[in-house]
Every structure is written in C-alpha cells, then in structure tokens.
C-alpha cells in the first residue's frame, strides 16, 4: 500500500494516515489493529478516540494533510458484517486504477513480512478538536443562512440508528441554527447489533418506524436518520394530508439540487460554467 500510494517517494517527509471506525462490533479493536500496523511500518497515524462519521474521516485526511485513511465500517449493511474503507489523500475512497494497484502490492506481501507492533509513538489520538473544525467547515458550505433562520423552529426528530451520527449530526444541525431537535433515545445507544431495527439501512421503511412514531407524538415536521457510519441519510416528511412520506435517495438529491441552484442564482453565485454531475 505504501508503494502504490506513492508514499515511498516522500523520503524525508512524514507520511500519515487517518484511521476511524463506526459502531460495528469489534470496530475499535480492528481500528486499533490497523493503526498499530501502520505505525509499525513507519507511518504516522491519526486515530480517532472513538467512533466518528465517515465524512469526518474524509475531512480529517484533508485537514491534517494526510496521504490516506481508513474507516472500519460496513456502512448500512446487516450487523453480521464489518469492512475496511480505504481513502486517498483527497479524502475520497480509493478508485481505479489505484484500487487494483494496491491489491497487486498486497498480494506480493506475505503475512510473515507484515510488522504488527512497534513505533506506537507514531499513533496520535484525535477527537474533539477535529469535531469542532469539522463543524466549522460544514458551516462554510451554508448557502443562505437567512433561509435557515426563518425555519429555525422546524420540529426535527433525528435517529442515528445506533451509529456514528449520534453526536455530530445534532451538533451540526444546532450549529446551523435549528433549535427544535429531538432524538430517538433508544437508538442513541451505540450498539453494533442494531437491536431496534431489522437492518440499519435508513432507506428501509422499517428502520424509520421508531423515528416516525416519536415524530407523531411530537407533531414533528421531519424525521431524519443516518446509517451506522453516517454517510447516508433518509428523510421522512409530511405530505399535504399530514401523513408521513419517505423521501428516497433520488428525490432527496433532486431537492438538494433544486435548493442549491435556486439559492445560488438568487444570491448571484451561479456562473455559466457551473454544472451538475450525476
């Protein structure tokens, strides 16, 4: 991985990676193991102190000028799974041709050659300060704060489905100006078994049941859910009859696009060379 990533060309420079994990069973153990292997092989590691959303891991890679990163997660898949997401220096997941290049290099290495411990001074624990920097960065992408402030009392129910969105999502919503945020207490408990849902995919209607039930009791306007690593959101809103309606991913994306384009146009920020990529 070091060779394929171009890390070997950075002689004299400190090579670093960011390592995170979500709520999956044994996620912390796996993340610490990943960090120890990197450190043992001479790579500096920024290891999150506890579970964090995938987008924050991506942000940290760029913010800390790291050469790559790893998040231990199985995203929205069933509880039996865990996984290893690899990231490039730009904070995005590794794509072609680098993905195959990394595998080719991995296949050249035997387990006996892999250093598993040592150099643990190269592991630096990160946490709260990155949360603050991440929230500040999120605020910079706000297009029109006045629009939000006019809706600051929007009644919102949020659930992380036992996952990594537990703290950061409500914090970000409040930092943007929303004042009426409620959470589903049973699903704020970090648990890799996801005991309150059949599957932790927020796009499955069943996973939204507890959120909608609380929303009904509180007469909420919106229910928002994030998946275990908080890189996927589902939204439920009320239709013109006051009934809950689940907005699918495509619909959500189109609403985002409509809002962004119209507000950028209104604020004079839309240029002729702007375009959307699907």
Regions found by a protein language model. Name each.
Residues 2-11, 138-149, 264-269:
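Phosphate/pyrophosphate-binding loops at sites that engage ATP/ADP/AMP, CoA/4′-phosphopantetheine
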Residues 3, 63, 175, 259-264:
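Active-site catalytic microenvironments for nucleophilic, acid-base chemistry
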Residues 7-81, 179-235:
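N-terminal small/polar loop signature for handling phosphorylated ligands or for N-terminal nucleophile
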Residues 12-17, 39-44, 147-155, 219, ...:
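Short, surface-exposed connector motifs at secondary-structure boundaries
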Residues 33-41, 64, 85-93, 171-179, ...:
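A glycine- and small-aliphatic-rich helix-loop capping segment at beta-alpha/alpha-beta transitions
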Residues 49, 109-130, 239-278:
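Proline/glycine-rich low-complexity loops and linkers
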Residues 70, 75, 82-103, 233-262:
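Glycine-rich phosphate-binding loop of actin/hexokinase-like ATP-binding domains
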Residues 82-209, 214:
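Gly/Ser/Thr-enriched, mixed-charge loops and adjacent short helices
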